[in-house]
Amino acid sequence: GAERRDHVERWSLGSVLALWAVDALAGLFGPALGAGAGAGPLGWVLSVLTAALAGLAAAAHIWRWWLWQPRRTTAVPLVWVLHLAYLWIPLHLLLRVAAEFGGLSPSLATHALTVGAIGGMTIGMMTRTARGHTGRLLEADHWEVAAYALIAVAALLRVGLPLIWPAALMTAVLLSALAWAAGMGIYSWRYWPILTRARIDGRPG
């Protein structure tokens, strides 16, 4: 089954906390230092430190994700959707490394986190908690799987398409928004009647 290793947990958390601290410094002093591509010496050091911490955090979170053995959850949509969403966190961090030196737009890293990780976690947990708290089995049918897939496609379109074809940015934004709306629309259509009625097991709540 899934493994938990304390040193991996420490590196996963510690590297991200350190990255956040450097982000805070960059926010406070970056404009004065000229941080980023073409920066002065101090700004360049800040960019290198940011990229190094983002790379370290990405490696730690990929390792952590792999220890969970996500390949064994492919038959359980309520679980694999969370593993898939989590994978966007190290992808976000790797994109930050590239963005730090002007290799690509920082917006791609941001959307890997927001659309991919947060969007996927949100749709996964909304379905899981809605089913659990209304007395239903923790099972996902083809409608839930379709919603999960559409949110994943939205992330791939928003991040992947501009990455390989920068001129298609606006097309990527439009297609991603449509996929997102469709995925959340399926959730709303499926779960409105579930969430506005009493529990099916007769228990309060």
Functional labels for PLM-detected ranges:
Residues G1-G205:
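Hydrophobic alpha-helical transmembrane segments of multi-pass integral membrane proteins
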